[in-house]
Amino acid sequence: MGLVMWLRTGVLMAILTGLLMGIGYLFGGPNVAFIMFLFSMFFNFITYWYSDRIVLSWYNARIVDEYEAPELYAIVRDLAQRAGLPTPRVAIIPSETPNAFATGRDPKHAVVAVTQGLLRILNRDELEGVIGHELTHIKNRDILIGTVAAAMAGAIMQLAYWARWIAIFGGFNRDRDDGGDIIGAILVAILAPIAAMLIQAAISRSREFLADEGGARISGKPHALASALMKIEQAVNYRPMREGNPATAHMFIVNPFRGMSIANLFSTHPPTEARIERLRKIAEEMGIYF
């Protein structure tokens, strides 16, 4: 499994390099394409080593210790021991939208982040189910490719935004000599966000089913995880997340963003109803009925 994740991460980095070189060639020819190649090498390095910090910074997440959040920290520590994992760092996101995600490049450098809203609406059993889900992502090493994909998707959309305005104003300054930059800007504005979302879609939705099963078995409470998923889904529909970056949607236990933006054209998660039904079957296997 580790080798597959490494290969998929390498493919994502190669895709980013190709996209950046293509944008550079479109707006500046071979010289700019080469500069973008060098930049992509630097960005790939930063993404691998620091993507978790990048993602956490998008949500103003704060690392806490066992003295600041004793109950949450104890749950993470105890379930990590049960899963045979080193205890990950714990972060709290200042958002009232209930949700959670895991990030990091490997189990030794992992972080489990939860929102204030999640801590507010879930009971202890439900919280254990959610933490178990995130720990399964860590154990299965989903966090590397998920975090790298989020950082890359965010970078692609941001670079496309900059390139669009640079091309438009640059085109005007050259008296619209051939309109090429304007056409290029339009193409980038349309295609780059789609490329970013396709990168997100490359993160298999089946990973969520596996993480649900793992979370149910680690916590021993599939019914509580099912209840948590329902609560989160209902709360997100009522109060979708406004802060952060849609490029991270696939990282959360439930997609926290709603609406008709490009970020929602590609589904990042299986339907919550299907996940709950699978948890019901897992519960029956464990002799639990709900």
From Swiss-Prot:
Residues involved in Zn(2+) binding: H133, H137, E208
Top enzyme category: hydrolase
Keywords: Cell membrane, Hydrolase, Membrane, Metal-binding, Metalloprotease, Protease, Transmembrane, Transmembrane helix, Zinc
GO molecular function, one term: zinc ion binding
Co-factor binding details: Binds 1 zinc ion per subunit.
Transmembrane residue ranges: 5-27, 32-51, 143-163, 182-202
Claim: Hydrolase is one of the keywords in the record: yes
Record's protein name: Protease HtpX homolog
